[in-house]
Amino acid sequence: MVEMNFKVDAFEGPLDLLLHLIGQLEVDIYDIPMAEITDQYMEFVHTMQEMELDVASEYLVMAATLLAIKSKMLLPKQELEIDYDTLEEEEDPRDALVEKLMEYKRFKEAAKELKEKEAERSFYFSKPPMDLAEYDDGTKVAELDVSLNDMLSAFNKMLRRKKLNKPLHTRITTQEISIDDRMNSVLGKLNQQKNHRLRFDELFEEQTKEQLVVTFLALLELMKRKLVEVEQSESFADLYVQGKGEELS
């Protein structure tokens, strides 16, 4: 018999103890030698009792389970006439125990892996958030009635239409356009309207691709400064640019 050489409080429960005993014997968990394992387990329980330690009820329940399995395996098998047409494999008394041991082993290995990851994470230090108050110019970003994704979607549709309508042979000319100039142009167009309101795509008529991009950026800047807002009456409806502020009065 393998010498008992472990601490009484080193196990988290009876399944943990059984896994230790099986490991000590270096046997296959699916082929547990019940006589030897049961004897060692009972010796452990007796050691706890001799040391006048409280033996948890779960250890006693497992002891009874092991003794029952050991007894079943010692019983002689009945010799019966075998009907090979209905022959079924006889159930192993250890099956339920092995299933519990394997499940516990999986949980134990998962817990070990999580503990290792926790230890590994302790070597990393999170950087505290930076105070960006000194960079705040006090300008409040306008709350959009439509999302930026809605605007980008509408803008991309215009780019696709521009590409489809583009002639096969074009003459390329370079023309620098500032965002400030385009902002004034957008405000001018809105100011020409009685209600200072234009459909989104009307701001982008007869423009090159480069001009479209500058106009879009100018529109975003105007929204940031709360000089215009983009509205949509319902989902999938046209977008409208509404002017606001002293510049349009």
Swiss-Prot record:
Principal location listed in the UniProt entry: cytoplasm
One cellular component (GO) term of this entry: cytoplasm
Annotated keywords: Cell cycle, Cell division, Chromosome partition, Cytoplasm
InterPro entries: ScpA (IPR003768), ScpA-like_C (IPR023093)
GO biological process, one term: chromosome segregation
Compartment(s): Cytoplasm
A Pfam family assignment: SMC_ScpA
Lineage top rank: taxon: Bacteria
Summary of subunit composition and partner proteins: Component of a cohesin-like complex composed of ScpA, ScpB and the Smc homodimer, in which ScpA and ScpB bind to the head domain of Smc. The presence of the three proteins is required for the association of the complex with DNA.
Function of the molecule: Participates in chromosomal partition during cell division. May act via the formation of a condensin-like complex containing Smc and ScpB that pull DNA away from mid-cell into both cell halves.
Family: Belongs to the ScpA family.
Protein name: Segregation and condensation protein A
